[in-house]
Amino acid sequence: MMKIITYNVNGLRAAVSKGLPEWLAQENPDILCLQETKLQPDQYPGEVFEALGYKSYLYSAQKKGYSGVAILTKREPDHVEYGMGMEAYDNEGRFIRADFGDLSVVSVYHPSGTSGDERQAFKMVWLEDYQKYVMELQKSRPNLILCGDYNICHEPIDIHDPVRNATNSGFLPEEREWMTRFLSAGYVDSFRTLCPEKQEYTWWSYRFNSRAKNKGWRIDYCMVSEPVRPLLKRAYILNEAVHSDHCPMALEIL
């Protein structure tokens, strides 16, 4: 069995100061996929995670204090691929892949469109490019686990107020349609597949006391390619972890 956790930490150094290593020692995943690390490699507190038995692979944005993804793993990967080979995205440190035998694990941070029209347009182009890239990758690496912050809620069950949020980035009709297309192209939302009726969230705004009121969004996913579906054992949201405005999601596979 393998346990994988995905977690948008909203600044890794801040999360470490809020007890992330102690929490990680308790949860003890085989692989931890991080998003929004917001640091450069020379700022990475590697010894903290090394002490817990993790090897670290980081892919940082060029801009300091922004974006960035990482994979921490107790198992030695056969290969690590940094980026997608597309400069506009790779400059922002959004995609890293580690291969373990015939299984590939990705940590991905999809763009947010909340800052305005320009970034929303960037996000929509990224979504098409991401799907094309993943589908091409799947020809050589069919067993994919695509973990990360997708910055999209798919269905009304995934968001606390679907009516009022229907005009907000993250729940726009065109974003939801993209996710429907992505899933129908041969990818599986592990949490929704294993927990069809659970209304749980992975992100809450820091404003309006949203987390205490559980006014949240489910935007963090462990997607898997169709060949991995039979291996799905358990998927669950760890909403007691409070190192970030997101909480982690765990996937256990056979």
Residue ranges and their predicted role:
Residues 85-86, 111-127, 163-167:
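Surface-exposed cleft-lining segments at the edges of enzyme active sites
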Residues 64-79, 198, 210-230:
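Conserved beta strand-loop-helix elements of the APE1-like EEP
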Residues 37-40, 45-113:
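Structured beta-strand-rich core segments of catalytic domains in phosphoester-bond hydrolases
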Residues 52-55, 128-215, 219:
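Metal-dependent phosphoesterases centered on the DNase I-like endonuclease/exonuclease/phosphatase
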Residues 7-8, 24-42, 105, 134-156, ...:
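Active-site beta-strand/loop signature of hydrolases that rely on acidic residues for catalysis
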Residues 236-254:
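Surface polyanion/phosphate-binding segment centered on an Asp-His-Pro turn
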Residues 2-16, 22-23, 27, 41-57:
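Internal alpha/beta domain cores that form substrate/cofactor-binding pockets in large enzymes
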Residues 2-10, 102-114, 147:
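Active-site-proximal beta-strand elements of phosphoester/diester hydrolases
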